[in-house]
Amino acid sequence: MALRFEILHQSKKSRARVGRIETAHGYIDTPAFVPVATNGALKGVLDHSNIPLMFCNTYHLIVHPGAEAIAAMGGLHQFIGRNAPIITDSGGFQIFSLAYGSVAEEIKSCGKKKGGNTIIKVNDDGVHFKSYRDGRKLFLSPEISVQAQKDLGADIILPLDELLPFHADPTYFHQSSQRTYVWEKRSLDYHLKNPGIQSMYGVIHGGTFPDQRKLGCKFVEDLPFDGSAIGGSLGKNLQDIVEVVGVTAANLSAERPRHLLGIGDLPSIWATVGFGIDSFDSSYPTKAARHGMILTSQGPLKINNQRYSSDLNPIEPGCSCLACSQGITRAYLRHLFKVHEPNAGIWASIHNMHHMQKVMREIREGILNDRI
């Protein structure tokens, strides 16, 4: 079955809404945070059964072990032991972000090109690139990307698109936008030949230009996509993100779920959920955890600071996550980080993921009570 989306409550205070997405592998209560499991695994988190939707990267899974190999083993759900919804990207995001950086990295660096030259050529057919693992030459077209995602068997899939950095040349930006929408139409056409249980979101580009964002919305709205994903360059800071998301969401129909690609840190979620965004994906909680940044109700906690060296409080008093409930103290966690124990990142990741799910429950409650 393709997904079904139901709006359960529309806030009286904003465009925020509480909804439910139904897929063949279960329900997703929205707004939802969607952690990124790059290679089919959430770094430092062993149990993902309580995570409603997980984001896996097609590019990395194509490179190893291969989409066909995963299909032969029963698909991605069977391969990673997950009986809950999965979303996969097209592979394009990873290819271009390896060259230009991710959306989050772009905001920090204003889109300075990264050192690795993995892209060989981009044309209307698709993108030629080198494997980041062994340097072998690979090719990704809209049809190849969608077939790979069908082999993986994710519940929600995305069309191939080109991710451009904030500093892209205006002429090339226009060419890229036109090519991206051709790729998306080809992706959708290929998907609709055999949709099965999968659903496809259309990706809206347009950079920081309101008129281009509106054109992107019209393109996606005019085609039978199952949902909308706000992608592409979102600017250089949170203010830009808010402006881009606000304009884009205002030009989308309420009937389809809306996903914000590559943005899922707490300040951005709080700043944009009022526009009616239904899901946010990011590797932020686990990446922050591996660097000793602990998410708490009182704000981020830098566990490596000397002040926690003899702090015998739980990571966060009152927290019910596995780390806190097992008595992992701030002093002990700091010690684990200082001696480079792998357990440090694991405990921190478990806590951070639990915190994100807690925040999303609070957000849904706030919308239901018309406070957000």
UniProtKB/Swiss-Prot annotation:
The active site is at D89, D281. Its cofactor is Zn(2+). Residues 262-268, 286-290 are annotated as: RNA binding. InterPro entries: TGT, TGT-like_sf, tRNA_ribo_trans-like. GO terms for molecular function: metal ion binding; tRNA-guanosine(34) queuine transglycosylase activity. It catalyses: 7-aminomethyl-7-carbaguanine + guanosine(34) in tRNA = 7-aminomethyl-7-carbaguanosine(34) in tRNA + guanine. Binds 1 zinc ion per subunit. Pathway: tRNA modification; tRNA-queuosine biosynthesis. Zn(2+) binds at C319, C321, C324, H351. PANTHER family: PTHR43468, TRNA-GUANOSINE(34) QUEUINE TRANSGLYCOSYLASE. Homodimer. Within each dimer, one monomer is responsible for RNA recognition and catalysis, while the other monomer binds to the replacement base PreQ1. Catalyzes the base-exchange of a guanine (G) residue with the queuine precursor 7-aminomethyl-7-deazaguanine (PreQ1) at position 34 (anticodon wobble position) in tRNAs with GU(N) anticodons (tRNA-Asp, -Asn, -His and -Tyr). Catalysis occurs through a double-displacement mechanism. The nucleophile active site attacks the C1' of nucleotide 34 to detach the guanine base from the RNA, forming a covalent enzyme-RNA intermediate. The proton acceptor active site deprotonates the incoming PreQ1, allowing a nucleophilic attack on the C1' of the ribose to form the product. This is Queuine tRNA-ribosyltransferase. It comes from Chlamydia trachomatis serovar D (strain ATCC VR-885 / DSM 19411 / UW-3/Cx). The gene is tgt.
